[in-house]
Design a protein with these regions (language model features):
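Internal intein/HINT superfamily modules and their associated LAGLIDADG
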Residues: 1-270
């Protein structure tokens, strides 16, 4: 529907929806038009656009309901590796240059555009660091509702995730705050986060992670003997994940099966 196809009553409703706090993206979805159409209506009616920081359009309500593996994964990843400023209403994810394509995945997930991805140069190493900054109070509020808050380091709280998506949520945690190597894997987080992972692995994989260790100002768990079993469970085929870690996991599992002589077998301790 084009702008000139709206009735006067619909135009009035659109302006009222915007004045009531609804996002341009949400209104455009409601009327099945592009965000540019709604944006033009707002400008032509001399309304002041909210949140001057926001220059890109995206789905601000993407995290309102966690009803897919992708939503659960990104929620876990943001909890582990995202930064939130509640006062200025923005969220930022910053990654090293080799992981830039992960930001491409995130932008596509929120229906954004690649112009949201920017980079800066590290003042010591001079390496490029890529980041995406998402602005919008509605978006930040949805993250808050899932226990992602400003200043969360070492104080992270777990979201209520449907059971069938918990492994995706935990994989997001591992991609953000985990370390994977041949002899062990580990995860850094708050006491609450690590206890959550402990319970999940015990219930679903019959794996006991007994000790939560102190690590600087936070906590850490290590998994050695059962690491392959955990990795196989979390990093299933074609799952959304950080490419670098996904490739590492698949290589480790392949090497483990070759060493065991049980290629193609599910009986290996993985």
């Amino acid at each position: 529907m084009k702008k000139n196809n709206f009735t006067n009553e619909q135009m009035k409703d659109i302006l009222e929806l915007y004045n009531s706090g609804n996002s341009i993206y949400a209104i455009s979805k409601l009327y099945n038009v592009t965000h540019k159409v709604i944006n033009r209506i707002i400008i032509e009616n001399n309304l002041i656009k909210r949140d001057g920081r926001k220059k890109h359009f995206y789905n601000q309500t993407i995290f309102n309901n966690i009803d897919s593996p992708e939503k659960a994964y990104w929620l876990g990843f943001i909890l582990a590796d995202g930064y939130i400023n509640e006062k200025k209403a923005f969220m930022r994810i910053k990654l090293q240059e080799c992981d830039k394509n992960h930001l491409d995945k995130f932008v596509k997930f929120i229906d954004g555009d690649k112009g949201m991805i920017k980079y800066e140069t590290h003042n010591i190493t001079y390496n490029k660091q890529y980041y995406v900054e998402v602005n919008g109070r509605e978006f930040i509020k949805s993250l808050n509702n899932h226990n992602i808050r400003q200043g969360k380091s070492s104080k992270e709280h777990i979201a209520k995730i449907p059971f069938e998506y918990r492994k995706d949520y935990i994989r997001g945690l591992f991609d953000g705050d985990g370390h994977i190597e041949e002899k062990r894997i580990d995860l850094v987080g708050s006491q609450e986060v690590l206890e959550y992972v402990q319970r999940y692995l015990k219930e679903t994989c019959d794996i006991h992670v007994n000790r939560i260790l102190e690590h600087c100002n936070t906590k850490r768990i290590y998994i050695g003997f059962n690491r392959y079993k955990v990795l196989k469970h979390l990093y299933y085929d074609e799952c959304i994940s950080l490419d670098r870690k996904y490739k590492m996991v698949k290589l480790l599992l392949q090497v483990a099966m070759l060493k065991s002589g049980k290629i193609g077998s599910d009986s290996l301790n993985i």
